Amino acid sequence: MAVALRFTKMQGIGNDYVYINGFQERIDSPGELARKISDRHFGIGSDGLVLILPSATADVRMRMFNADGSESEMCGNAVRCVGKYVYDHGIQVKDVITVETRAGVKIVRLLFEAGKVCGATVDMGEPELHPARIPVLTETSGDGSQQRFVARPVDVNGQLYEITAVSMGNPHAVIFMKGIDDLDLPRIGPRFEHHPLFPKRTNTEFAEVISSTKVRMRVWERGAGETLACGTGACAVAVACVLNGYAGRDVEVELKGGSLHIHWDEASNHVYMTGGAVTVFSGEYYI
């Protein structure tokens, strides 16, 4: 007999996930469920699945599964929505929510409009720039001169791209170029995602600098394909802008689904991401 599973669909600038309250619902095969519900024709339709669970180290724990069923370390847009979900559903009714992820505990400061949660600023932690910890395969010299992977030429299917590699808890390859709207991402995105340089695969951001305070990007997400937005990707692009001398530490990142404000704090080395969080609808899914 089919069992009704209660869910809420939420989105952060178009990056949409199905959220399930793990305090109340039991999910035995989350990867398989993610594949089914993410299908935009035969399921609910989403970029993946997020489980909100009890935590021993934070207010809640989130597990995030991509549309292909693979589990990811975290998602910046999703963690904002987790903060809103936790507040709206009375799991924790306070302005600052701590969320345990596979990339560490994230601090989510909720933003309110007319008494309702409309978004959040998230402390995304410090960017990881050491190639081995991103991870990206490269030779590291003894004098430390190869401790960052910045604007390095990489052959991808016979074409050279300058890649800057950053981890925001998950791996990112950032490429700066003109004409990002003309890119055939479904064709070239998988070539980066599965490139042997990245042993855990990678998210790939194609970024176009508009000014010292604004940059546009498109993203090919590991396990999900092209999405309207990627929070950790926007953070990686902002960090890469600074590393390449293209922008300052406060930058607006414009994605297909909307814009995020990213601040890379020089004193703490932490990256802060600010953006919206929206509930789309709730319902029951039968399994």
Curated annotation (Swiss-Prot):
Active site per database record: C75, C230
InterPro entries noted in UniProt: DAP_epimerase_AS, DAP_epimerase_DapF
Main location group: cytoplasm
GO molecular function annotation: diaminopimelate epimerase activity
Keyword Acetylation: no
Pathway annotation from the record: Amino-acid biosynthesis; L-lysine biosynthesis via DAP pathway; DL-2,6-diaminopimelate from LL-2,6-diaminopimelate: step 1/1
Subcellular localization, as worded in the UniProt entry: Cytoplasm
Reaction it catalyzes: (2S,6S)-2,6-diaminopimelate = meso-2,6-diaminopimelate
Bilayer-spanning residue ranges: none
Residues annotated to bind substrate: N15, N66, G76, N77, N170, N203, E221, R222, G231, T232
One of the GO biological process terms: lysine biosynthetic process via diaminopimelate
PROSITE patterns: DAP_EPIMERASE
Highest taxon of source: Bacteria
Site positions for Could be important to modulate the pK values of the two catalytic cysteine residues: H172, E221
Subunit structure: Homodimer.
Membership in a protein family: Belongs to the diaminopimelate epimerase family.
Biological function: Catalyzes the stereoinversion of LL-2,6-diaminopimelate (L,L-DAP) to meso-diaminopimelate (meso-DAP), a precursor of L-lysine and an essential component of the bacterial peptidoglycan.
Name this protein carries in UniProt: Diaminopimelate epimerase
Species in which this protein is naturally found: Desulfovibrio desulfuricans (strain ATCC 27774 / DSM 6949 / MB)
Gene: dapF
